[in-house]
């Protein structure tokens, strides 16, 4: 996935990456040139054959729904038969139940420690531990700075994060309380109005409207799998839908865009 590729780029390992897939957002700033030299096997799900065709020594995956017990790309056992080990991001397999398919259910809340573990694991695999610690320390400083900027929020504001919608006339995919967006909201002093443990539950606009979120955060992405992947489509929907358009957050212009990635 793109985010796993970014971690490898940050570790100075771009020359080790022979293929990448599952792209939702843009290339991480500063790594456009490095990424341009890496073959994109698919914007979404690559085939098993496309992955093994690159003859990798290691396959990294962000999500078990792609490479896992019932992975749409393949299973770890299939790769193991070819002598290819699989590394799965801790963010998708620690404290999380993916047995029901889809995006899974988090038993414990996401924390940045999962990302730090991923960085350190990959740094150890490629013997660049010092660089791994530099990346971890930089991310910690950036998070501390972000928290300091909004320390006054103190849970007074609430929010809903709208990722996308498979169709505009059905319930949207929104961020559950235990995933990465839920963690970000909590870190920034925002109350997530969605209380589901699912990673990306579908929740109706009528239900969302009843919670009256102070802010709507709309995901902006390059992917075009669903109509609402397009931020312009999201904006038009919020402005014209009979329910969404009368929500105070929409009427008062408290709709904000954020670039979506895949953790």
What feature does the model see in each segment?
Residues 262-263:
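Conserved small/polar residues in nucleotide/adenosyl-binding loops
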Residues 30-39, 131-132, 187-197:
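A local structural motif
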Residues 1, 18-20, 59-62, 86-89, ...:
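Structural recognition of the beta-strand scaffold that forms the well-ordered cores
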Residues 1-25:
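Extracytoplasmic strand-loop-helix segments at the start of, or within, the mature domains
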Residues 2-9, 131-188:
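Basic- and aromatic-lined ligand-binding clefts that recognize polyanionic substrates
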Residues 15, 81-85, 251-253:
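A short helix->loop->beta-strand "cap" motif at the edges of active sites that frequently abuts
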Residues 22-125, 206-246:
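Acidic/His-rich segments in extracytoplasmic proteins that coordinate ligands and/or metal ions
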